[in-house]
Amino acid sequence: MQKASRKNKKERGVSIKVKTSVHNLSKTQQTKLTVGRLGLGLIIIQHGPYLQITHLIRKGAAANDGKLQPGDVLISVGYANVLGYTLREFLQLLQHITVGTVLQIKVYRDFINIPEEWLEIYDLIPEAKFPVTSTPKKMELAKDESFTSSDDNENVDLDRRLQYYRYPWSTAHHPARRPISISRDWHGYKKKNHTISVGKDIDCDVMIHRDDKKEVKAPSPYWIMVKQDNETSSSSTSSTSDAFWLEDCAQVEEGKAQPVSKFG
């Protein structure tokens, strides 16, 4: 009987020690988060067989709640036990959760430390600093203002360059007119009604000088025709007489012409 009682006492002591050790390892925290535009607002890595929180996204659901901390290990999300989950499996689980859903999150606190390489690259994670309030909008506004100011300056320069090419009238005070073609505007000339007198007199605008003694005649085209006819046809006498007759008629017409003529 005494031996049995001793064994029971030893077993009780051992069982008590195991419970205390498990209690120290399984210090848990739980909270409820509402899925928002940024999800749960957590940056999670796979640390061995566990999913561990490394960073909280600013203005995210977890950061606003304030109960979860970097280093916590996920136990369950909603009704799903995620111990042993990979990141891919956890992502597939979150894909079926819609915005506005309230999830109960349970984690281990002070269970394992975050790897040093993840602590060193905190500044390199853009999600940990997202979203920064009003700075992106201010930057966009500043960019827009710079673009608009540069555009305005360009427009002013263009206005200065083009002001000499604008029409002198405005459409508000003058009726619509058909635009003038550049070739006509630049190369066209205006005809003016002006009478020019041509003749041998000194009073004429254009005076013709002739030497009555030696009258130079231009070579008659009929001589060429006569030569061609002589080479090609046998009736050379008739063609020659016709050519001389035509040339005589031309000389008679020149004698009848007036010495002064006017052109409008």
Swiss-Prot record:
Highest taxon of source: Eukaryota
InterPro entries cross-referenced by the UniProt entry: PDZ, PDZ_sf, PDZD9
Domain (PDZ) ranges: 22-109
Xref: PROSITE patterns: PDZ
PANTHER family hit by this protein: PDZ DOMAIN-CONTAINING PROTEIN 9 (PTHR22698:SF1)
Name of the featured protein: PDZ domain-containing protein 9
Gene giving rise to this polypeptide: PDZD9
